[in-house]
């Protein structure tokens, strides 16, 4: 048996001379030197796709075909009409338009959007496509959100919360969070204190000064009592998130406590440096070493009273490693918080009452390996009394709802497939879902009523679809790719089985002139009886002549999905696999145990045993090559 199980580059170097024949088109230089040009040949897909408020334009960052590989992405826009061509925007033009197309928080009536751009806060009129600037400071403001009535915008500045009145422009500070050492009582103690008391007893002038100081202090304290009450964080603690209730009755403060600073970090030598000397890159800590943690405070407004919450219930030994506020319900009566323990084996969902900070656990997910999977952080409010979230509770990432009291848990999707993205429509009538329902090798978009029921498939073309919905929910900007075509922007209607029209073309004409295949996906039998997905490149598929040898490509990145019908993140290797097949090699690309896309058990199959099933799947791949191709 001749099996080459090394890096692809070395495999080609070992190829028999008699097999160095290619079926590549004479119009295309099918050489390693050419295909490894990467983005200069294949192009770079559009990124940061957003819509204009009126839904007429799609904005994105991109470079035109043939642009140098190290050129920065540029701003573009294209009309959301079939046959339109992208228009390049200058950076000053984009700076003017950026607040208009930035993501942000919609007002309750969906007529305005609060956004942040370049550290300042703006409000966008969605009907008139106009922008009102609210702040213009050197301080960085962020996280703008409307209050329940749409009359105020909350935002953050210098790790504190503020509110601005949209009618009169008044800015009010809602929190006074401080770091460092709290001030101490400066009154002298001991001998010096006794001496000071003696002085006031002996001299009228000292008593008069003390009386005036006492009156002034009382007045300062009276005025200070009308302001937000300050409170101090621990040493080494910082503000991570502040989330204000829509009715401004309370806020949640999430802090981060640095632990990784004291952990030992792995080092990688960096040989190519400006100085000419080898330098050290400190890149990451080891699993199980000291890590960051966080805690959550409930702050009553306007009093500023603070209540620290036990976010991991019934356990004082564990601190949450990851805490995120998933939002408040529209009524402002409760917040939703997600917390993952620092061993990554338990995820809690809690509701927190705006009245007193009372915490109610509504869902707990435990995993003996680790919490993960697609859409792991997807959660929010379906309405004022129900929560939606994605969980791997049944072994696959699916959508659930539960009451804010923890009752009435319902699973809205099920099957041996995954919900990879979930979003609630602005009117809260629909879920927009990206799923692998068709097969693990496809990603399509569906629309489903918020209460569950029949899902309507929006996209129909094979491959992967990443959809951004227009503000009026009529159109979709679809970043669509197939196994042999990179992602491009398409436009279509948000309707079942909609037809989409291509608006961008990223690869060079040179690359498009070559016949790139969609590799067949086969299931090979593993030694434990489980079928393992494989992309296969045969010499006959690309016009080559078999040379009796095979190559097994091993994708890296651990938890990655690479066997699918869409464009691979390993696109250079995709082209290289063509190159090998054209020269006679049978190439296998295996989604071994530990890869993404096949549910929780597949994802965690390598837990504490890397080099077990993942390696055996490749050994079984070599047996498949021997059996099917005599290699």
Locations of regions flagged by a protein language model:
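Compositionally biased, low-complexity segments enriched in small residues
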Residues: 2-3, 18, 22, 566-567, ...
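Hydrophobic h-region of N-terminal signal peptides that target proteins for export
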Residues: 9-19
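Serine-hydrolase catalytic core recognition
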Residues: 428, 457-459, 464-631
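Sec-dependent signal peptide recognition
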Residues: 2-10
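Beta-propeller folds
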Residues: 19-469, 474-487, 491-494, 509
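Extended hydrophobic/Leu-rich segments
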Residues: 9-10, 165, 328, 617, ...
């Amino acid at each position: 048996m001749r099996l080459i199980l090394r890096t692809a580059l070395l495999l080609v170097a070992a190829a028999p001379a008699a097999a160095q024949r290619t079926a590549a088109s004479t119009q295309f230089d099918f050489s390693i030197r050419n295909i490894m040009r990467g983005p200069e040949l294949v192009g770079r897909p559009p990124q940061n796709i957003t819509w204009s408020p009126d839904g007429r334009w799609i904005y994105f960052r991109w470079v035109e075909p043939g642009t140098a590989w190290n050129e920065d992405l540029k701003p573009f826009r294209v009309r959301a009409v079939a046959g339109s061509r992208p228009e390049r925007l200058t950076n000053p033009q984009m700076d003017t338009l950026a607040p208009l197309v930035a993501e942000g928080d919609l007002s309750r009536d969906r007529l305005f959007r609060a956004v942040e751009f370049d550290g300042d806060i703006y409000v966008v009129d969605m009907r008139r496509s106009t922008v009102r600037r609210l702040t213009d400071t050197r301080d960085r403001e962020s996280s703008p959100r409307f209050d329940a009535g749409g009359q105020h915008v909350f935002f953050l500045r210098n790790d504190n919360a503020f509110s601005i009145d949209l009618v009169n422009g008044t800015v009010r500070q809602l929190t006074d969070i401080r770091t460092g050492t709290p001030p101490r009582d400066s009154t002298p103690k001991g001998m010096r204190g006794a001496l000071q008391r003696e002085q006031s007893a002996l001299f009228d002038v000292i008593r008069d000064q003390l009386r005036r100081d006492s009156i002034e202090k009382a007045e300062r304290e009276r005025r200070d009592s009308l302001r937000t009450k300050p409170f101090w964080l621990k040493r080494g603690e910082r503000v991570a998130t502040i989330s204000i209730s829509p009715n401004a009755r309370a806020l949640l403060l999430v802090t981060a406590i640095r632990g990784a600073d004291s952990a030992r970090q792995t080092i990688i030598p960096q040989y190519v440096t400006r100085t000419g000397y080898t330098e050290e890159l400190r890149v990451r800590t080891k699993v199980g070493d000291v890590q960051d943690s966080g805690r959550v405070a409930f702050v009553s407004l306007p009093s500023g009273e603070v209540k620290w919450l036990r976010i991991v219930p019934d356990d004082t030994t564990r601190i949450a490693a990851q805490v995120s506020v998933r939002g408040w319900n529209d009524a402002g009566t409760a917040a939703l918080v997600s917390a993952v323990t620092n061993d990554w084996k338990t995820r809690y969902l809690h509701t927190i009452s705006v009245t007193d900070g009372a915490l109610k656990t509504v869902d707990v997910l435990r995993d003996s390996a680790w919490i993960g999977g697609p859409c792991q952080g997807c959660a929010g409010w379906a309405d004022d009394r129900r929560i939606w979230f994605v969980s791997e509770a049944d072994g696959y990432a699916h959508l659930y709802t539960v009451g804010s009291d923890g009752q009435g848990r319902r699973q809205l999707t099920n099957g041996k497939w995954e919900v990879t993205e979930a979003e609630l429509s602005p009117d809260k009538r629909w879920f927009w879902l990206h799923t692998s329902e068709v097969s693990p090798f496809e990603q399509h978009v569906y629309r489903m009523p918020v209460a569950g029921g029949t899902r309507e498939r929006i996209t129909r073309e094979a491959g992967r679809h990443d959809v951004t919905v227009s503000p009026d929910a009529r159109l979709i900007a679809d970043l669509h790719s197939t196994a042999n075509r990179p992602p491009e922007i398409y436009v279509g209607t948000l309707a079942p089985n909609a037809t989409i029209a291509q608006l961008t073309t990223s690869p060079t004409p040179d690359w498009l002139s070559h016949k790139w295949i969609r590799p067949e996906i086969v299931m090979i039998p593993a030694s434990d009886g489980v079928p393992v997905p494989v992309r296969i490149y045969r010499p006959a598929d690309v016009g080559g002549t078999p040379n009796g040898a095979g190559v097994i490509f091993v994708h890296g990145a651990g938890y990655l999905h690479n066997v699918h019908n869409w464009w691979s993140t390993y696109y250079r290797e995709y082209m290289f696999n063509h190159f090998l097949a054209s020269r006679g090699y049978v190439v296998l690309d295996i989604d071994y145990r530990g890869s993404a896309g096949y549910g929780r058990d597949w994802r965690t199959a390598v837990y504490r045993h890397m080099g077990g099933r993942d390696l055996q799947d490749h050994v079984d791949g070599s047996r498949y090559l021997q059996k099917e191709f005599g290699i």
